[in-house]
Structure formats: structure tokens, C-alpha cells
Design a protein with these regions (language model features):
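An amphipathic, basic-hydrophobic helix/alpha-beta surface used to engage anionic
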Residues: 12-270
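Von Willebrand factor type A / integrin I
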Residues: 1-24, 28, 46-48, 71, ...
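Glycine-rich, flexible loop segments associated with nucleotide phosphate handling
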Residues: 84-92, 278-288
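Active-site-proximal flexible loops/turns
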Residues: 60, 232, 281-284, 332
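Generic recognition of short, well-ordered alpha-helical interface segments
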Residues: 179, 239-242, 281-291
């Protein structure tokens, strides 16, 4: 009797070994996705790691392995993570999967420094019932997270900025009833109810307001220059990007429409941004600016004069704010032309000065 039990057990093991073979790897699908593509420094977000069994057989052993850039910090001490020699953080999960099922693991993480962070290919493995064989594969899907710059720590420029914006805002009283309609933009909560377009809002885009083209509505261009010969260009450029964030946030709060441009190459187009953002207001517009600033490198896109030359058009009521690392336009004729076309409403902020 015991012999029959032993034989049955051996046959069962062999059957399970065959059914759980590593050739089932082709039935597996793995992916990892951040739940936010744009985050603030030290903001906690999640990496969602999924493993799916597309086949008709049980997978008795499966493993997911993620290697995170050393800038990542895992926020949950219960997550199985450890540091490897390269400075990266290795995260590993083991599980089993019934047929046509999937499992998901959520890992809370954060990043302190501004920049673009690409996720390394996700490694997933399966093994047989006896643990004698194991096969692995990499998921090659591209995933990235953009970390925006911090708010400016030294906001000594705030008083100068406030005075400048006050001068720009005065122009809203030049004409009382402007009525030239040019389009729609996202409602920010500061526009009068009569400006809301209920027809456009009903299309499912959220509350939309009419854009009126008139000199009474203040407008600003925020320009960030990365063409500099300053000695400490890295820290100064980081300060420029932080100043730009703070300035754009103030413009959003005051309801002053603005466009944005940065004279720098972008590290990646992962977030779908460009180094210019058209005029607008609202959460989506501000997010586009932050995405641009998060991707900005220390490499200039053009010379400083070439960058400014793109804005040499009659500005009307538009003011210009130029943020630059140092005294980079001391002898620039282009800057003087821009000042003339702006009617004098040009504010130059240098990162190496406390203002």
C-alpha cells in the first residue's frame, strides 16, 4: 500500500513538474508604470508592477525584479528592497498565479532632485515545481518620471516681481469693454461668470472661459536663459529653474496669462513637452511649464541673443520677465530692443544676485 502511495506521489510530482515548466514564460506579461508622470521633489508616488498569466496553466513560481535609480527612495519599510553595489535599489516580489489571472504590487517611492528618471527594464522570471529550472525575460516598455524643480528658496526677488506685475496689471484699466474673442482656455476660478462658455464646457473638457484679445488684460512672457559662462553654472541654473517655477505660480495665483520658454535642451520628450509653452492659465498649463522645467538640462538650445530675438515683436501690453544665471546680457543690443518693444516692461532677474 505504501509503495502505491509513493508511486502516486512521484507521478503527481512529475505531472506538476511538467505542467509548471519554464516554457510557460511565453504566456507571461509584465509591466511597471508610475501612477504620476510629473511629481514634485520628495512627493510620494507609486510604481505599479503587474504580472499576468495569459495561459491555461498554473504558474507555481514567478518573480518580479525592479532596479531603481539611486535617486529613488522607497517609502515603505515593509517592501522587500535592498541596495546593490551600483547604488541602485533592487526590489523583488515572488508569487504564484492561476490561469488567466494577474497580480499587482504597489511600491511607494519619492525622488528629491529635479530631472527625468527612466525606469530600467522590468525583469520577470518563472520556475518549475521542483525549483530545478528558471527562465527570465525583460519587459522593454519605456517608462519615465519627470521631477519638477523646487520653489525658490531665496525669494528676495518677490518685492521686485510684485512691483513689476503691478505695473503690468495697471494696463487692464486702459479700456473698459474689450470684446475681441480669440478662443477658450481652462477656467481658473478667478474669471467672472459671464466669461464662462457653457457650450464649450458641456463638451466634457471642464469649465472653459472665453479668451479676449485686448490691452486691458495683462499678459507676460517668462523667459529662462541657460546660455551663460558663469563659473557655478549648474547651481545657478537650478536656481533659475526654481525662480521660474515660483514666478509662474505667482502669475497663476494672480490670474495673469503668460507664455513660457526656456533656452535649454530637454533631457527627454517622455512627458510630451517642448521648451516652449503657449499662453494660458490653469492646472494643465502650469503642469506643462513644470514638465518643461523638469526636463531642462544645462545645455543651451541657442545663444542668448538668438533666444531673445524670437520675441522681438511689438509687445503691446505684454511684459517680459527674463531669468538668467548671471550678467549674461551686459552688452546685448537684442535685450535693449526687447526692452523698447515691451514699452519698458522688462524685468531681468539674475540668479547670482539676491535682488
Amino acid at each position: 500500500m505504501s509503495l502505491l502511495v509513493a508511486v502516486a506521489a512521484v507521478l503527481l510530482v512529475l505531472w506538476m513538474q511538467r505542467r509548471s515548466g519554464v516554457d510557460r514564460l511565453a504566456d507571461m506579461r509584465a509591466d511597471h508604470t508610475p501612477d504620476a508622470k510629473l511629481v514634485d521633489p520628495d512627493e510620494t508616488f507609486h510604481l505599479d508592477m503587474t504580472l499576468q498569466n495569459m495561459g491555461r496553466h498554473y504558474i507555481l513560481f514567478a518573480q518580479l525584479e525592479e532596479r531603481l535609480h539611486q535617486a529613488f527612495t522607497v517609502r515603505d519599510p515593509d517592501i522587500p528592497a535592498w541596495e546593490v553595489r551600483s547604488g541602485e535599489t533592487k526590489i523583488s516580489f515572488s508569487t504564484w498565479l492561476p490561469p488567466r489571472r494577474q497580480v499587482r504590487f504597489r511600491v511607494p517611492v519619492s525622488i528629491s532632485a529635479r530631472g527625468v528618471y527612466c525606469l530600467a527594464p522590468l525583469k520577470f522570471s518563472i520556475g518549475d515545481f521542483l525549483g530545478l529550472q528558471e527562465r527570465s525575460r525583460l519587459s522593454g516598455k519605456f517608462r519615465a518620471v519627470v521631477v519638477a524643480p523646487k520653489e525658490a528658496e531665496d525669494q528676495g526677488f518677490a518685492d521686485v516681481l510684485g512691483g513689476f506685475l503691478g505695473n503690468v496689471s495697471v494696463r487692464r484699466f486702459i479700456h473698459e469693454d474689450p470684446a475681441l474673442f480669440t478662443g477658450f482656455r481652462e477656467y481658473t476660478g478667478r474669471e467672472p461668470m459671464k466669461q464662462i462658455s457653457w457650450y464649450q464646457s458641456a463638451k466634457g473638457r471642464g469649465l472653459m472661459v472665453k479668451i479676449l484679445d485686448h490691452t486691458a488684460e495683462p499678459q507676460v512672457s517668462v523667459l529662462v536663459n541657460a546660455d551663460t559662462r558663469a563659473k557655478d553654472r549648474g547651481p545657478l541654473l537650478e536656481k533659475c529653474y526654481s525662480m521660474a517655477r515660483t514666478i509662474c505660480r505667482v502669475l497663476e495665483e494672480r490670474g495673469i496669462a503668460y507664455d513660457f520658454a526656456v533656452n535649454a535642451e530637454l533631457a527627454s520628450s517622455a512627458a510630451g513637452t517642448d521648451n516652449t509653452v503657449g499662453e494660458g492659465l490653469g492646472a494643465n498649463h502650469f503642469a506643462a511649464v513644470l514638465g518643461c522645467l523638469g526636463q531642462a538640462t544645462y545645455v543651451r538650445a541657442a545663444s542668448g541673443d538668438e533666444f531673445l530675438a524670437e520675441f522681438l515683436v511689438p509687445a503691446g501690453a505684454r511684459g517680459h520677465i527674463l531669468i538668467t544665471p548671471s550678467d549674461d546680457f551686459a552688452a546685448s543690443r537684442v535685450l535693449e530692443l526687447l526692452r523698447e518693444l515691451s514699452g519698458g516692461t522688462l524685468l531681468v532677474l539674475q540668479a547670482d544676485r539676491s535682488v
